[in-house]
Amino acid sequence: MLHIRIVAVGKLKEKYLKEGLREYIKRLGAYSRLEIIEVPDEKVPDKPSDTEAALIKRKEGDRLLAAAGDKDYIGVALDPRGEMWSTEDLADKMRRWELYGPNLVVFFIGGTLGLSKEVHAVCKAKWSLSRLTFPHQLVRLILLEQVYRGCKVNRGETYHR
């Protein structure tokens, strides 16, 4: 069984997102071992300088990496500049990760300014969910839905489209 750890910046606040996450966590229980770890975000000024932005991303990145824990994992950075994957691509990657290991996959979700270069450096893949921009809190729900869909594909089960 694949072990999935989602490490995200910021605390989920919206009730509708929390409810959606609970639903997919429940559904995924039959397919994988799942952990979601939230790390504190930094206060971002309205117009941060490049230096301020880099420092904020570095602090948040250090927290993400500490929360990721075990070094023996496949890191996946969720990044709008990453590679676009279809559902079938994700299902195939999940199948290979489970078969060939390491059996832990860590998905990194950055804060408002994105992920630090240090987080990107430990990631074997950079995945863009869409060319659209989503709030980083909504990305958690989209990610869980896609992981659930990938699990269903890998088991040959139907999923409403």
Curated annotation (Swiss-Prot):
Q: Cite the entry's keywords alphabetically.
A: Cytoplasm, Methyltransferase, rRNA processing, S-adenosyl-L-methionine, Transferase
* Enzyme Commission number, as recorded: 2.1.1.177
- Molecular function terms in GO for this entry? rRNA (pseudouridine-N3-)-methyltransferase activity
Give me the residues that bind S-adenosyl-L-methionine, please: 78, 110, 129-134
Q: Which Gene3D superfamilies match?
A: 3.40.1280.10
> InterPro entries from the entry?
Alpha/beta_knot_MTases, RlmH-like, tRNA_m1G_MTases_N
Main site of residence?
cytoplasm
Q: Which subcellular locations apply to this protein?
A: Cytoplasm
Question: What reactions does this protein catalyze?
Answer: pseudouridine(1915) in 23S rRNA + S-adenosyl-L-methionine = N(3)-methylpseudouridine(1915) in 23S rRNA + S-adenosyl-L-homocysteine + H(+)
A single GO CC term, please?
cytoplasm
Provide the family line: Belongs to the RNA methyltransferase RlmH family.
Q: What does this protein do?
A: Specifically methylates the pseudouridine at position 1915 (m3Psi1915) in 23S rRNA.
Tell me, how does this one assemble?
Homodimer.
Q: Which NCBIfam families match?
A: PRK00103.1-3, tRNA_RlmH_YbeA
Q: This protein is called what? A: Ribosomal RNA large subunit methyltransferase H
